[in-house]
A protein has these predicted regions:
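Catalytic center-proximal scaffold of phosphoryl-transfer enzymes
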Residues: 1-341
């Protein structure tokens, strides 16, 4: 599907803190234990390569508009446009040779922008169009769009601690309207129409134009209003979930595993955790007994189809990318999930 859900949680490998990243949709869950949780790490999860490649094209330069770079640096980077993609070694060597005075922050941004551009420029990889996630910054810029979880958007309101009874009433009244609107979005998903899409867009503006006089509440309302585009992706693509519960539940399984077993002691052990948790959760979503699946593979009976084939078949039935059409990259509902085996 052209959309995926992502989340991460702390894990420990040989007593050292690392991160477990989860990528999922209604048909599978994939676990990846990595040393960090920065944007490049998440990119490596979405776009696994034996050796990362880089591309300083127009998209990379556009991403670099978000930071301040000297004009001389931008002119130097513009000369790289003719290079379609570089392997990591040559890219970093050239970067160090031609721009030795970059700060660590500037260098990291250039590396990240070039890696993201290479991911988007790869014609052979199913590039994800939309990530459903929370508002963690490492998920920004990786895909054309993101959709933030409505449950996460509602949590700051619940965490408000008003000391005045009137403020309590204002918060509770607004939360009631907030979740009423959320339920209207869920209803829209069942039978989307252009008229209802327009009405809900206008209703969002009305709801989050509310001024209560309770300063902290009004600040939260204004913050949510500024996120209209990323909260209302569902109006254009009704297949998108309104919340990220699926990824959070997958993460919670890793937390429970961590509570019982503390953590793997070696990288191989971490890979084994990831592999078996991926298989177990994916089999569950596909209605396959994990016990019978493992027995089938160990006994070499091979009576149960490959999970990847089941995912492809179910994806066609569910139409997870129907509103994107079937001609764009990554939009085909029959595209094979790259992590499933």
């Amino acid at each position: 599907s052209p959309w995926q859900q992502v989340d991460d949680t702390l894990t420990r490998v040989d007593g050292q803190n690392q991160s477990c990243h989860v990528v999922c949709n209604p048909l599978y869950s994939a676990y990846f234990t990595r040393p960090g949780k920065d944007r490049l790490t998440v990119l490596g999860v979405l776009y696994p390569q034996a050796q990362r490649t880089y591309c300083l094209n127009a998209e990379a330069r556009q991403l670099l508009e978000h930071i301040q770079l000297p004009r001389a640096t931008r002119r130097c980077l513009a000369q790289w446009q003719s290079v379609p993609g570089l392997a990591e070694g040559p890219f970093l060597s050239r970067l160090d040779a031609e721009l030795p005075r970059l700060t660590a922050y500037q260098r990291q941004w250039i590396i990240t922008a070039a890696a993201i551009a290479a991911y988007h420029a790869d014609p052979l990889w199913p590039v994800i169009d939309t990530l459903v996630c929370d508002d963690a910054p490492q998920f920004d810029w990786l895909t054309a769009d993101v959709m933030h979880c409505w449950v996460h958007a509602g949590r700051p309101y619940k965490k408000l601690t008003p000391y005045v009874a009137a403020h309590h009433a204002l918060r509770d009244a607004f939360l009631t309207r907030f979740w009423d609107y959320y339920r209207e979005l869920r209803t829209y998903q069942q039978a989307p129409t252009a008229a209802e899409r327009e009405r809900l867009s206008t209703a969002f503006d009305t709801l989050f134009a509310t001024h209560t006089g309770y300063v902290h509440l009004d600040r939260l309302i204004a913050k949510t209003q500024a996120q209209k585009a990323i909260l209302l992706r569902v109006l254009e693509h009704p297949e998108l979930p309104l919340h990220n519960n699926a990824a959070e539940l997958a993460v919670r399984q890793r937390v429970r595993k961590r509570d019982v077993s503390f953590g793997p002691r070696t990288p191989e052990g971490a890979k084994a955790w990831d592999t078996f948790m991926t298989l177990a959760d994916t089999a569950k979503k596909l209605g396959v007994s994990f016990y019978h699946y493992v027995y089938d593979r160990v006994s070499q009976a091979n009576q149960i189809p490959k999970l990847a084939d089941l995912i492809t078949e179910r994806a066609k039935e569910l139409g997870l990318g129907a509103s994107w059409g079937t001609t764009g990259r990554g939009a085909s509902t029959g595209a094979r999930t790259p992590w499933a085996t």
